[in-house]
Regions:
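Extracellular/periplasmic, surface-exposed regions of secreted and cell-surface proteins
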Residues: 1-181
């Protein structure tokens, strides 16, 4: 009778700090800013903590005196401009940077083999950056209707980019490796 016993442990340490602050000026507008700093054992021994900033701001134009006193304010009840920017990081998985061995059983014996996905010691943290600019508009369609008194519209433009994306790339069959990170 053959018994197979396996054990798997992934030592992994991660911690971070988050700081954020919001300031509003009545109902006219506001802004917030902050950052998050993360450290992970998956970053590698020589790596430093990664910091990701964020911020947003809005201006409710419909609250300004020049807008409230205009003829358009009876139809456009709410008009807000907004913008936001932020960065986020995705860390490599534990051991994605280091050569590892997998275990298996061949017949009645144990075997070690290299995994099909080759590690990459040059992996960095994947960082996504996003900018969003938008507006919110509320229209008053008239109080005489029993329904559909108002309509709200929101529009946004956003752009996201990613640096150091982590994904598997097929390797040449002659390399003996299936994929490389």
């Amino acid at each position: 009778e053959t018994k197979v016993v396996t054990d798997y442990r992934t030592p992994f340490v991660t911690y971070g700090y988050l700081a954020t602050q919001r300031l509003d000026y009545g109902t006219y507008g506001g802004l917030s800013a902050g950052f998050r700093t993360d450290f992970s054992s998956a970053f590698g021994a020589a790596s430093t903590p990664q910091t990701f900033p964020r911020g947003d701001a809005y201006l409710r134009v419909s609250e300004l005196g020049i807008f409230k006193n205009s003829a358009i304010s009876t139809t456009v009840e709410d008009f807000k401009l907004r913008a936001a920017y932020g960065e986020a990081g995705i860390q490599p998985r534990p051991f994605d940077r280091y050569i590892t061995l997998n275990t298996g059983v061949i017949g009645a014996g144990n075997a070690f083999y290299f995994p099909l996905t080759q590690s990459n010691p040059n992996l960095n943290v994947e960082i996504s950056k996003e900018l969003e600019i938008g507006t919110d508009i509320g229209l008053n369609l008239g109080k005489s209707s029993p329904w559909l008194n108002s309509v709200n519209f929101s529009g946004s433009y956003w752009k996201r980019s990613t640096d150091n994306a982590i994904f598997n790339v097929d390797a040449a069959p002659s390399s003996g490796v299936g994929t490389v990170k």
